[in-house]
């Protein structure tokens, strides 16, 4: 039997680091999914009719950014390996823009109406592109980190658990951050505009 399929290539620390990375991405995604529209409602800069349009703008932004998916895949394939692998650099490049756009989506910008809707669409599109830049190579890593099929299965299972936890994490992290922020809503109560921003900073970073 091929020794490559029996040898251990990953330490528990490496598996944990990879899993925590996926956890973080899912936490950011689900924070936006759960609180983005609610934030705009709390900010009070959009009419009811305009608020109804926001989910459709978010969907349109994600559709536009979906065009970016195969482009990222092609860039990964064409990138020469300079010792860091083909996938890791893309995740690193995406980190800062992803944090930036996550924060910008929860900034109470002093505009309203069509201008604010345009802002939401543009920043959500850029956020989705940054997320694609991070998520596509992150998902692909599980297939290339080890040629050992048993180890790969364990990696996928372990990281999958962290992904699932990350999806639920905002519902725990948000109240905790609100407890820390002076005058925050805490465990219960309505979040203020500034608390959405503090949570975006905390979860994004």
Regions found by a protein language model. Give the residues of each.
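Membrane-embedded alpha-helical bundles of multi-pass transporters/translocases
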Residues: 2-205
């Amino acid at each position: 039997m091929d020794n490559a399929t029996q040898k251990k290539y990953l330490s528990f620390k490496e598996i944990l680091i990879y899993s925590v990375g996926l956890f973080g991405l899912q936490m950011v995604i689900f924070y936006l999914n759960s609180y983005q529209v609610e934030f705009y409602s709390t900010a009070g800069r959009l009419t009811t009719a305009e608020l109804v349009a926001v989910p459709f703008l978010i969907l349109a932004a994600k559709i536009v950014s979906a065009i970016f998916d195969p482009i990222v895949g092609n860039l990964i394939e064409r990138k020469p390996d300079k010792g860091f692998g083909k996938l890791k650099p893309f995740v690193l490049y995406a980190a800062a823009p992803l944090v930036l756009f996550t924060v910008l989506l929860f900034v109470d910008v002093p505009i309203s109406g069509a201008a604010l809707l345009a802002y939401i669409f543009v920043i959500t599109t850029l956020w989705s592109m940054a997320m694609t830049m991070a998520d596509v190579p992150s998902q692909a890593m599980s297939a290339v980190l080890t040629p050992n099929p048993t180890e790969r299965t364990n990696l996928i299972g372990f990281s999958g658990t962290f992904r699932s936890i990350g999806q639920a994490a905002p519902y725990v992290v948000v109240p905790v951050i609100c407890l820390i922020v002076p005058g925050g809503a805490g465990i219960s109560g309505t979040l203020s505009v500034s608390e959405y921003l503090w949570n975006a900073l905390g979860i994004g970073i």
